[in-house]
Amino acid sequence: MKTIKVSVVTPDGPVYEADVEMVSAKAQSGELGVLPGHIPMVAPLEIGAVRLKKGNATELVAVSGGFLEVRPDRVTILAQAAERAEDIDVARAKAAKERAERRLQAKQEDIDHKRAELALRRAINRLNVANRNF
């Protein structure tokens, strides 16, 4: 089967590089599936999982926003933060989730609720990817 080169890159460096058969990601416009030979496009990404299919295996990468650039022979994901499922520290993600939930429940005026909501979404996404809840 044909493959497409995929790179997931953050400001800290590359997170994932491989040839895959299909890339699925959650864009702001909805779920995207990219196969080899796809028309060129750029799409802003939501916080979510990028699914990378190779044969019968699917690898997951948690991304916290960014952009997906598609060319016929390559997909590049430029993410603010990204982690492979096996690299996620579950205890740290649970602690971040609990911290964000406490901040949201406190309802104090000095708390940036939008930032706390984003932190909660990122933590839940990391836990879902680590536990393969997709």
UniProtKB/Swiss-Prot annotation:
Q: List the record's Gene Ontology CC terms alphabetically.
A: plasma membrane; proton-transporting ATP synthase complex
Q: Which Pfam families match?
A: ATP-synt_DE (PF00401), ATP-synt_DE_N (PF02823)
Primary localisation category: membrane
Compartments, record wording: Cell membrane
Q: Which domain of life is it from?
A: Bacteria
List UniProt keywords, sorted A-Z: ATP synthesis, Cell membrane, CF(1), Hydrogen ion transport, Ion transport, Membrane, Transport
Question: Which InterPro entries would you find in this protein's record?
Answer: ATP_F1_dsu/esu_C_sf, ATP_synth_F1_dsu/esu, ATP_synth_F1_dsu/esu_N, ATP_synth_F1_esu_C, ATPsynth_dsu/esu_N
Membrane topology term? Peripheral membrane protein
- Which Gene3D superfamilies did the record assign? ATP synthase delta/epsilon subunit, C-terminal domain (1.20.5.440), F0F1 ATP synthase delta/epsilon subunit, N-terminal (2.60.15.10)
A GO MF term: proton-transporting ATP synthase activity, rotational mechanism
CDD domains, sorted? F1-ATPase_delta
Q: Member of which family?
A: Belongs to the ATPase epsilon chain family.
Primary role: Produces ATP from ADP in the presence of a proton gradient across the membrane.
Q: Subunit structure of this entry?
A: F-type ATPases have 2 components, CF(1) - the catalytic core - and CF(0) - the membrane proton channel. CF(1) has five subunits: alpha(3), beta(3), gamma(1), delta(1), epsilon(1). CF(0) has three main subunits: a, b and c.
Protein name as annotated: ATP synthase epsilon chain
Lineage, highest ranks first = Bacteria, Bacillati, Bacillota, Bacilli, Bacillales
